[in-house]
Amino acid sequence: GDVYKRQDEEREEIYVVGSVFKIQVYSLSGNYKRTLNLPYDMSFEQVFDYDKDSLIFNDGREDVDNPVQKGTYYYLMSKTDGGMRPLPFHVKYRITNRFRIRLRNGDRQGVISCMFSVKPLLKNGDEVILSEFSNDTVFSYGKEGAKPLLVRTPAPRSTFPLKLMSVSACSRRFLFLDVIEKVYRRNIKKLDGDSFVYDYREKEIFTPVLVNSDFIPELPVEIDNMNGSFPKYAGASSIHSREFMQYYRRGNLQGRACEAASCLTRDDIYVLVLYHFN
């Protein structure tokens, strides 16, 4: 699986998620300090820095033969000793972002598995947005507990095929949503869904068009906050430095993008662009 890290500058620690079963903790200088282990019947799917004492994660373990499971999948984990505390969300009939198909050919059998790009957790500053695929309500969870953000209608299990919905970014007024049908299609390389925005003020849903006006002409933007910890009400996208410099040399950048390009070196690989929504 992928190796990724979370950093806590106040504790001067880095949390490396190199396995679905454990997190290794290092100092900022790279010295190993300790390991945080999961019980045998759990696995990490998403992990985020939550506060000075805790990480937050969801359990990715799935029993395809028993969809009615223990019902608790979201936890806070102590950064010190790995102790866990469940979040107050109970799921009876879980819907996951994974697809598994059992194939049989005579005496031989196998399993095809894939994972959809939508994910249930999103870090939003000091809060976490939880769009559990089985629930009809999207919540924001923080110091003051859970707060409902959006109620799905119709409910998830009343649609066929199932539609997985997650939050990709948010502002005080808008909630950015990704929706994808949970359908297996043969010989497809990428499973794309649809993007929508819910407007709290107008109480309407529409299809967004996001562009970066620092590019000439304006560059379409795809927000991807799923795997990072970003400031509240912000969105992130990335562009390869080589492509970014091509825009710069052709004179197709202006404003802060032009300033950023002038500072790049040959050691820079990707440029992270942070968008703040009003």
What are these regions (language model features)?
Residues 173-218:
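C-terminal structural cap/anchor segments
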Residues 6-8, 12-18, 53-66, 75, ...:
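Short beta-strand elements that form the blades of beta-propeller/WD-repeat-like
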Residues 34-40, 83-93, 147-155, 205-212:
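Beta-propeller fold detector
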Residues 1-4:
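Short, small-residue-biased leader/transition segments that mark boundaries at the very start
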Residues 71-142:
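Loop-centered beta-sheet repeat module
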Residues 25, 70-81, 135-139, 190-204, ...:
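Beta-propeller blade signature
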Residues 17-72, 86-102:
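Asp-box/WD-like beta-propeller blade repeats and closely related beta-sheet repeat scaffolds
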